[in-house]
């Protein structure tokens, strides 16, 4: 199979889940010509089937809810649930510092808005730095009517995920 490629892109994003599409949005907004490729005939990756939830300490929605959290608590929690010597402290630091900025960017530059989950605890809320809620978020529902023809491109959601049509 010999197919010719006669396209020019600055960034090629592989996949169409939360992380991939956020990367594509940021690259596009930064002036790059972006191509998103997806092996499936449907969009959304595992983010679609899992409900699109994210775990970001100190996010804007938790701050707005006056949640008790801190960067140090997030560090302590991640350390408490990670095998000793098996994590890269620089990557963890980047995650907890930049995660809230990512949520801010999406909130300010896209239609993606999240709902704070004040009663959705960390997996181990009693561990050092653990919290009883406000770190996990899920996307606000999007009307299927707004998606029009693009609705049929979305990966099937988990059976327990709510989808509103109007």
Regions found by a protein language model. Name each.
Residues 5, 30, 40:
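Extracellular/periplasmic catalytic domains that process cell-envelope and extracellular macromolecules
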Residues 11-36:
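N-terminal Rossmann-like FAD-binding beta1-loop-alpha1 element of flavoenzymes
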């Amino acid at each position: 199979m010999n197919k010719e490629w006669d396209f020019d892109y600055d960034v090629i994003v592989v996949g169409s889940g939360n992380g991939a599409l956020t990367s594509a949005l940021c690259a596009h907004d930064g002036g790059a010509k972006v191509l998103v490729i997806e092996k499936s005939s449907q969009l959304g990756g595992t983010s679609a089937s899992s409900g699109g939830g994210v775990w970001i300490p100190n996010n804007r929605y938790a701050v707005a809810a006056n949640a008790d959290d801190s960067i140090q608590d997030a560090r302590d929690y991640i350390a408490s649930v990670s095998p000793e010597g098996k994590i890269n402290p620089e990557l963890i630091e980047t995650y907890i510092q930049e995660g809230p900025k990512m949520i801010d960017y999406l909130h300010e530059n896209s239609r993606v808005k999240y709902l704070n989950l004040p009663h959705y605890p960390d997996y181990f809320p009693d561990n050092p730095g653990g919290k009883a809620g406000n770190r996990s978020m899920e996307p606000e529902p999007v009307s299927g009517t707004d998606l029009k023809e693009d609705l049929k491109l979305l990966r099937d959601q988990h059976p327990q995920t709510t989808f509103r049509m109007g």
